A protein has these predicted regions:
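SAM-dependent methyltransferases
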Residues: 1, 106, 117, 216, ...
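Hydrophobic/aromatic beta-strand patches that form the interior of the parallel beta-sheet core
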Residues: 4-6, 34-36, 124-126, 150-152, ...
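Short, solvent-exposed amphipathic alpha-helical segments in soluble enzyme
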Residues: 20-24, 141-145, 168
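S-adenosyl-L-methionine/SAH cofactor-binding core of RNA-modifying enzymes
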Residues: 63-90, 96-98, 104-107, 112-156
Length: 272
């Protein structure tokens, strides 16, 4: 799988994805993640990506040209690289010199080595937007397709020219009913949730199915050593070795927690 992220602040999206399980997945060749500076596709010498809105309003709107040219460039040719963490906020040079911009973008996966993952697959374009459909585990699983390709667009300022949404974007995704300063953080959340569901990313194949929401319930309580701490003891059933009883206990506790914390996840007849 290959994921390209387009942002004015690529380091914000890239940094968390270079760590932990997602970073290891890239090193192992399970996914290739590239963060690009949208200004590399701006047309003027100032590398402008925003302008005042028609009709009058507060703030600035992101221009359509950089998005179209960036996505078409990434779709139509093998992308050179993704923005390296140390260079993400230090992009210089001519805005019209695409090759110069491309020479600065480096693969985040493993020491700059280009990974042939999803490069030839049709790219689906996702816009991170508070106006999008609410992101959940079901949508994460929908996008976690080995060998597929995603291009993730990050908004900023007051929004994006509607022509980008109408004619370039395949899906709008919101990570919640709140507004961030830019879409790079949302892109990192989206990418992490998707990539961890790819086969081989998590060490235990059962880890993802046991996650909260995967079964429609919140996750059951977890315990580890010591058996007793400050008078609080691990439930005896978890020490019994009876796998059937343990499974029943876990499902019951998951159901109880879901009823208490997120009853909206349950059918009407199971909320009481």
């Amino acid at each position: 799988m290959r994921i390209d992220i387009l942002s004015l602040f690529p380091a914000i999206a890239a940094a968390p994805l270079a760590e932990s399980m997602i970073g290891k997945a890239q090193q192992r060749g399970l996914v290739s993640i590239h963060a690009h500076n949208l200004r590399d596709w701006a047309r003027d010498k100032h590398r402008t990506t925003d302008d005042a809105p028609y009709g009058g309003s507060q703030g600035m709107v992101m221009k359509c040209e950089p998005f179209f040219e960036a996505v078409e460039s990434l779709r139509d040719r093998r992308p050179e690289t993704g923005t390296h963490l140390t260079e993400a906020n230090d992009q210089t040079g001519s805005a019209n010199d695409e090759e110069a911009g491309a020479s600065k973008r480096k693969d985040l996966s493993s020491g700059g080595e280009e990974l042939d993952l999803g490069v030839n697959a049709p790219a689906r374009v996702v816009l991170m937007s508070p106006a999008g459909r609410r992101f959940d585990q079901r949508i994460a699983a929908e996008y976690a397709v080995p060998g597929s390709r995603l291009i993730v667009l990050c908004g900023h300022y007051e929004g994006i020219d509607q022509r980008v949404i109408d004619h370039l974007v395949d899906d709008e995704i919101s990570i919640g009913d709140y507004v961030l300063t830019n879409g790079a953080l949302a892109a990192a959340v989206f990418t992490d949730a998707v990539v961890r569901l790819l086969p081989g990313v998590l060490g235990d194949a059962q880890s993802a199915p046991d996650d909260s929401f995967s079964s429609g319930l919140l996750e059951f309580p977890q315990y580890t050593r010591p058996v007793e701490y400050r008078g609080w003891r691990v439930p005896d059933v978890l020490l019994s070795g009876n796998h059937g009883a343990i499974a029943d206990w876990r499902r019951q506790k998951a159901l109880e927690k879901t009823r208490r914390v997120r009853p909206d996840l349950l059918p009407e007849d199971k909320r009481l």
